[in-house]
Amino acid sequence: MSKQTPDKLCAIEDDANPILEKVRACDVLILASPVYFSRLSGTMACFIDRTRCFTFGKNGHLALKGKVGVALAVGWCRNLGMETTLASLHGAFLVHEMLTPPCHAAGALYGVGVVSGQRDENFIYKRDKLGAKDDQEGLYSVKLLVQEAVRVAKKLTNER
């Protein structure tokens, strides 16, 4: 972090730097992860680790403070790690002092989980790898939560 400059958030030269610049510029940050072994994916964990430049960097210090964060998870089953994945994403937002608005209408206090493992009439899982598109409740909850996040971000922008 000591080598950070206004134009260079991270000393590691890779394709994350342009993404980190977009994260710094956003008003609403939506992080979505698949659920693997009752937790967020390793790729998402690595990405979150790279955002430490916004908390501990000399030029990016608290760059995400006051921005709005939305946590989403996609899992095969409704209750096999959705909550822990959402909690990890939510925790990252809190470390950055971001706002994570709940949406009671969506039943979303920490984010939204969408189920990809849909069952047939015999309660047997279908083999559809795009089953998340059939989770109407989950997708509608995502829509409501994102609308709430945008509403909060607009309100914050108007107050500045």
For the regions a protein language model found, what residue spans apply to each?
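Helix-loop-strand module that forms the ligand-binding subsite of alpha/beta enzymes
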Residues: 5-109
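Charged, often glycine-rich, active-site loop that binds/positions anionic groups
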Residues: 1-8, 116-120
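Glycine-rich phosphate/pyrophosphate-binding loop and the adjoining helix
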Residues: 94, 99-160
